[in-house]
């Protein structure tokens, strides 16, 4: 995904306000061997790009002053109540160095799972993303979580996710193995089932 930005000359609160009034958003590019670079971006284009999941989880081609560099979106600052992006941070990517980032989770096949079909359970998505490590070339846009075999009362954990080649969970996630999805039967469904099993007097 390509992002076009411009070098930012002015600095300070007043300059940032003038840029916002002109429909621009301030940003910074850091990391790698180059010095941090202050940039400005078109606010409307950035606002729409931020609605796309891939913008948050993919390697981006950032073009500044005709020079292209590969970056990851690292931080976004929003206005507390206006539909306004105040600032964005991008980190340069080194093709030979592993990234520590978060990958979105896409949950599949809950509707055909035993939990839903046999027990009318509700499958809850406990996590929406998970921390991974990989080289930039191996970075997945998202990770699929197959729920087709989950049963009522069961949970799926981080280590149950099938990871693409070259992708691993970060050390603390691997050690903690947190729950990413769980299947629970609503209290009403349990009591209804119990009543149905009560023998007739």
From Swiss-Prot:
InterPro entries attached to this UniProt entry: Rbsml_bL25/Gln-tRNA_synth_N, Ribosomal_bL25/Gln-tRNA_synth, Ribosomal_bL25_b-dom, Ribosomal_bL25_C, Ribosomal_bL25_long, Ribosomal_bL25_short, Ribosomal_L25_dom, Ribosomal_uL5_bac-type
One Gene Ontology term of the molecular function aspect: 5S rRNA binding
CDD domains: Ribosomal_L25_TL5_CTC
Single biological process term from Gene Ontology: translation
Keywords: Ribonucleoprotein, Ribosomal protein, RNA-binding, rRNA-binding
Keyword Coiled coil in record: no
Signal peptide as annotated in the record: none
Coiled coil: none
NCBIfam families attached to this UniProt entry: bL25_bact_ctc (TIGR00731), PRK05618.1-2 (NF004128), PRK05618.1-5 (NF004130), PRK05943.1 (NF004612)
Complexes and interactors: Part of the 50S ribosomal subunit; part of the 5S rRNA/L5/L18/L25 subcomplex. Contacts the 5S rRNA. Binds to the 5S rRNA independently of L5 and L18.
Similarity field: Belongs to the bacterial ribosomal protein bL25 family. CTC subfamily.
Protein name: Large ribosomal subunit protein bL25
Native species: Burkholderia lata (strain ATCC 17760 / DSM 23089 / LMG 22485 / NCIMB 9086 / R18194 / 383)
Gene name of the record: rplY
